[in-house]
Amino acid sequence: MIVMSIMVKSVNFDDYQKTQTSYKDTNFLQSAEMAKLQLSRNHIGEVEALVFERDGLIVGQTIIVYRRSFRIFRKALLLHGPLLDYNSITDLPDLLEALILYLKKKNIASLSIHPYLTNLIRNEELEILKEDKADEVSKVFEKLGFEQYLDPEQALVVNQMFVKPIDTFTTSDEMLAAFSPSLKRDLKKFTALNVKVEELSEDNLDQFYDILVRTAERKGFSVHPLTYFQDLKRNFGKSAKFMLAYLDCPAYLAYLDENIKSFETKIQALKDGPQKKRTKGQIADAQDQLRSYYKRLEQFKTYQNTGDKLPLSAYLFMDYGSEVVSFYGGNDEAYLNFGGAVLLHWEMLQYAMRKVI
């Protein structure tokens, strides 16, 4: 199909994959790996890889998912696509017109496009820093008859992202220094508790899934079956990082025992030593600390954990292109006090930092 010198070509996934990371807006939802995963799921009708050429050169490409609408009609969906240079939108009108005509030839009733673009940026206080960043692109779509609205079916994927830019830091220590005092205290505290992070292998994804399902039940969202995540891991390989934060139980018990003995020794030394004006207060403070450690020990016994690891939080991160994206995940509500998610995300920030370096 050729329109205004833009040619739309259907290609196999292997050919598509050769150039899929050549764009600034490269993302895993517009990858051949994701297309293969979608095809492996029975509820997906058809998935197609397209490239757009001008004068023999590829100027864009996209993965399209075709779905049934009201049993009779078919609709086309582009999540985080198409891939192209949005900084120079000269090709965009012709590209979209060519795509529309291509889909009409396939008797597609509707086309939904969710470009991977930032339109509004807010800070931590939800104050608007930048808006209408994609205004020029939006105008192109409007001229071609597209209506702009929030698709509730795709809101969890394309609505908002919490982004941590790290390109201004040269080391992880610099990034840590920029954190708030309270966050730095939490990282230090949770590390002292012997909370650790590891990457799960394909054989252990049930640990991730168990936490995800319980989080979904608690918060009221649906999740794919375990086989979806196993297939995702097979398709993306090392780019799909299933991360688990867990409590090292023997080390945690040793930490409690060490502190209990330390405060018992301190209290006895204060009682045996010279009784000064502030000694009584020091003893009371030490006894409060001692009781808190005994309380933690008794609380740990109620967990009835028989293994050396107590799973706390689990997240799936997609390491793709210039991004590391938190895609799915959750926490065990009973163990939020150990801060598993905090340390897990800090670990992945450091991973992303090492990747940049």
Q: Where do the model's predicted regions map?
A:
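Short, Lys/Arg-enriched N-terminal segments with co-localized hydrophobic residues
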Residues: M1-M4
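Long, hydrophobic, well-ordered secondary-structure blocks that form the structural core
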Residues: A134, V158-P165
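Short low-complexity, flexible loop/linker segments enriched in glycine and/or proline
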Residues: E125-K130, K164-I166, R214
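Acyl-donor binding region in acyl/amide transferases
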Residues: F73-L156, L310-S313, M318-I357
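A conserved beta-strand-loop-helix scaffold within acyl/acetyltransferase catalytic domains
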Residues: K9-D55, V59-R71, G145-L156, I166-N337
